[in-house]
Amino acid sequence: NWVRMIDQYDCIFCIVDYHAITIDYKPEEMQKRILNAAAVNIAAGLDPNRCIIFVQSHVPEHTELAWILNTVTPMGHLERMTQFKDKSKQHRENINAGLFTYPVLQAADILIYKGEAVPVGEDQVQHIELCREIARKFNMRYGETFPDPMEILSEAPRIMGLDGKTKMSKSL
């Protein structure tokens, strides 16, 4: 539970609008969806006075670091990502480089803050494992810079969607 984590960690929560544009979306609705995501998180109990909540695209260093991390990330690692394979099947008409390198941007989102504990659902564990691998490769090449982030799984690591077939999504 993110609200409880605020008592144990210095928490940073990112509204990931760049991740959201890797699949089809309506640009004219994005601002509304960003505000809605912020409102939902605050309504769920995240206190902006006790944690940081921000919009990914407002911090250009996220994409700058992602670009640098791309240079140490083997293509084969990205090709094996389960979520890329699943999303590619769901969005056949829009399989793009952003979707392919999504995990590298996610790693940048974590590593830019030297994140050590990352709350994720079980479907994201593979992404955290890749993030650790990217951090290690970067550290070997450029010197000790990033920690090895570890996933923190919730008590309910996967919440099913209303259709009972797929997981619930918090996508913008």
Task: Describe these PLM feature segments.
Residues 85-172:
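Active-site cores that bind ATP or allylic diphosphates and position pyrophosphate for catalysis
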